[in-house]
Amino acid sequence: ITKEPELCARVTELPVKEYGVDAAILYKDIMSPMVAMNVNVELKAGVGPVFSTPIRSMADIDKLEAFDPTKVDYIAKTITLLTSGMLDVPLIGFCGAPFTIASYLIEGGPTKNYNKTRGMLIGAPDVWDALMTKLADMSIAYLSMQAEAGANALQIFDSWVGAVNADQYKQGIYPHMERIIKTVKAKYPHLPMAMNGVGTDHLVSIWSHLPLDVIALDWRSSIVMANERGVTQT
């Protein structure tokens, strides 16, 4: 479905029609843009995205190609369909954050412990930084493509970044997130940008220093708690 603009647009539209929500979020998988970097992704039923050749070394990272939007032009076409009269509410485009994307690439698929991912972050910082740099470049290009196609807002999903502590985040992840958000905001200052994660209570005060318009909280958090930690973007 995600490669068929008409079908994907209909699925995106369904919650608006059925529940009357005040915005639509693009129906895609967070790993969808990896096709544009020549990464073979298998979406295994009951498991999720799986990679037959996990990334574990600098040589593996060197094989990652720069993001080519023409390889996922169906995503831009879906957005244009939706924002050219199909929707009467704003459309939120999105991408997976570099850490969350990296966790799938390094682990080879979904995991419950992120041991290999944190192992690279802590034990091979040069390899980690090279991977994050490439994924940050992808995020900028992918979000820009969605903005150009007509998305009304942009969200970054860092679903699994709660697996790292605050110091690890500041050292190995924050600089890349800052570059992504600052670059995209500079190009599209009119578009609101949001970010969310799971189990990230210990990170939201760090996120508050990023030029985000919205910080989304999961069920473990409260707006009161976030405000007490200096977060004003909720």
Model-derived regions, located:
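N-terminal/domain-start segments enriched in small and hydrophobic, helix-friendly residues
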Residues: 1, 5, 44, 51, ...
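N-terminal basic, low-complexity leaders that serve as flexible interaction/assembly modules and, when applicable
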Residues: 1-45, 84, 174, 178-179
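An N-terminal domain-start capping segment
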Residues: 1-9, 61-67, 101, 109-110, ...
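Alpha-helix boundary recognition
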Residues: 2-3, 17, 62, 122, ...
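A short acidic, glycine/proline-enriched capping/turn motif at secondary-structure boundaries
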Residues: 30-33, 48-49, 58, 98-100
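Short, flexible, mixed-charge acidic loops at enzyme active sites
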Residues: 39-53, 104-117
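A gly/proline- and charged-residue-enriched helix-loop-helix capping module
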Residues: 46-84
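Active-site loop segments of alpha/beta catalytic cores
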Residues: 71-234
